[in-house]
Structures are given as structure tokens and as C-alpha cells.
Amino acid sequence: MTGEGRSAEQGIDMTKWLTGVKVAATAALVGLALAACSPKTETKTAAAPAAKTYTVGWTIYAGWMPWPYAEQAGIVKKWSDKYGVDIKVVQINDYVESLNQFTAGKLDAVTSTNMDALTIPAAAGKDTTFLMIGDYSNGNDGIVLKGGATLADIKGRPVNLVENSVSHYLLARGLESAGLKMTDVKVVNTSDADIVAAFGAPETKAVVPWNPQLTEIKKMPGAKQVFDSSKIPGEILDGLIISTEVAKANPNLAKALAGIWYETTMLMNQQDAAGQAAREAMAKLSGTDLAGYESQLKTTYLYYDPKAALAATISPDLVTANDKVRKFSFTAGLFGQGAKSVDDIGIEFPGGKILGDPKNVKLRFDPTYVQMAADGKL
């Protein structure tokens, strides 16, 4: 999905705090004679505790490859040094697992879609901030049939996808466009890491993947894409979410993350040797070549410039799109068993607009740091 929804088998070991303070023993002077023959001792200063390392998790998706590239290219270090924070960027092999780790506090920030930010950490009670909207899926997520011609042919088939992710949402929107319902298909939960292999199995009849897996599946025998996210522009958003508590306590971290992101995206958008080199590196990091990666970028409406991202963040369209997403999420039971209404979880937007319970805001779209980037104040 636009990364979307984009799940790792392994956890991450966080950097451990240094413990213990070294103290040198000091010999007592008993007299001038003893002092003259006794060995000298040095008094050591207690070591300062190590600075906290903030961990940012990412999974493979065209719109999220700037993060590992920024780490590789030294851009993360540059902005970390500027703001006096220690940032570690780590890959998680499974998208849903990355969000579970964020929810559990093992990651301070993570790449996510708007829907998954709502239905995983926010629904679990974790106050979450969408620090930056990076892109929206403009064809990066799709429904692919095996041996079918149109979306109507999906009726009665099992459909493999990352359950309860934006892939699930895309399927629902696609079915709606074809006059079908979710009860017309059977969802088979499949990790994003396994979905390409799953399509090759005889029993698999339909899948809903995102790039780069979508591109690979479309090349396979019998594959036919019958619907994609370009039909619902602006609804599947990808970006970086951060713990609201962490962001409030460490504004320099948020500033550094915004600086890292926009320096990297503006570089990759350059139509020169430097821009091409950045895109080539991102392609390699995502397991494809330059042509393959640039093909994926064509179906990713990426906000390379902070001014464009700011406009999207403060637009009324953001509220409209997320209203559709939250209604689907509640209907699908993704708010949890205790949720009684679509308004149980509050979502706050720029300007103070809130969808849902204003006393239980758990997802926030904060334009503060995008605004700083747009104003050149980072």
C-alpha cells in the first residue's frame, strides 16, 4: 500500500542506557613519609549518562525509501547533530509488526498510513501524531485477479491481503464501486512480505498488494489489475507518525525529522546527477532498479516540497478523506470490541477541527514542523 498498510517478524533492541558511575579510589595521606612512597591515585569524574537514542522504524514502500537513504547518505547524522539528538533509523520486515512495536513503545516513530495509525496505535489508546504527510497512493495499491477480466469477477473468490490495513480499505472501496459487498468475498490474511509468493500458489485467486509487491505480481502469469488507488485519490495517505508524548517532550527531535525528510525528498526530486544517484540508491534499498523504482514513484503522489505538504495538511479534503476512513474502520470492527460509536476516537486536524470525541483525541495531524520547513525555519 502506500506503504500503506505496509508487517516484521523480528523486534528491535533499543539502545540501552549506560549504568553505573566510575569512581576512583583516593588514597588517604597518613604522613609526609607515606605520601612520598605511596603510589599516586587519580580521581575520575563520573561519566555522564548516554543520551537517549530515538528509533524510527520503516518498511519497504516506494514513498518511504527516503528514510533508509537519508541514514545511508549521512543526512540523518547531519540533522541529528544540528539539533543535538541521536536518531536511529531501522528497517522492520513486517509492516503490521512495525506498528505494533510503535504502539508498545519500542519505536518512537514509524512509517504508517493514516488508516493504520488510527486503527492500531490510536485505537489501542496511544496518543499519536502524524508528523508529516509524505504522499498519497495514486495507483501504488491495487486489486489483482488471477484469470479474471473485471472487478466483478472477484465475487466469490478468496482475497489475500494484509487484513485490517489500507489494503482492506481499498478492497472495500473497490467492491463498492462494482456494486459488491465485503460478504461477496473471503479475506485471507497475508503478510506483505509473503504476498508475492502467495499469488504464485494455485489456491490464490485474488490479492490486494502495494508497491513494490504490486509491480512484481502484475508481471506474473494470469495477473490482471482490476482496481487501484488512483480511483480514490487522497484517501490512502502515507507518512511518519510519532508518539505525541515524545514529540511534545522533545521538539528538537521533531524538527530534526522534518529536516531529514525534506532535505531528502527535495534531493531525490532533482532532475540532475545528484537526484538520479539518490533515486538509484533508494531503488537498490527497495530491491529493484532505477527504472522499477521510478515506475513506482509515478503512482505515488509524493509531496517533495514542504509547501505542497503543508497545503495538503491544512486542506478541508484531509478531513473529508479521514472521515471516510474512520467510518470504514469502525464498521469493520477496527476500533476494538469496546467501541460503541464511530466517534469513540477523536481525530484532531489543523485549526482545531475534531472528528469524534474531543475528550479522547488519539490521532493528531499537526502542521507545526511542516510549517517550519515551508518557512525555511528549521
Model-derived segments and spans:
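Bacterial signal peptide processing site
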Residues: 38-40
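Pocket-lining segment of extracytoplasmic ligand-binding domains
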Residues: 193-290
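Bacterial N-terminal signal peptides that target proteins for export
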Residues: 13-25
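Conserved C-terminal helix/tail region of periplasmic/extracytoplasmic solute-binding proteins
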Residues: 326-378
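C-terminal motif of bacterial Sec signal peptides marking the signal peptidase cleavage site
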Residues: 33-36
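Short, Lys/Arg-enriched N-terminal segments with co-localized hydrophobic residues
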Residues: 1-13
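Short, glycine-/small- and polar/acidic-enriched structural segments
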Residues: 46-189, 205-211, 234, 371, ...
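Secondary-structure end/capping motifs
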Residues: 248-338
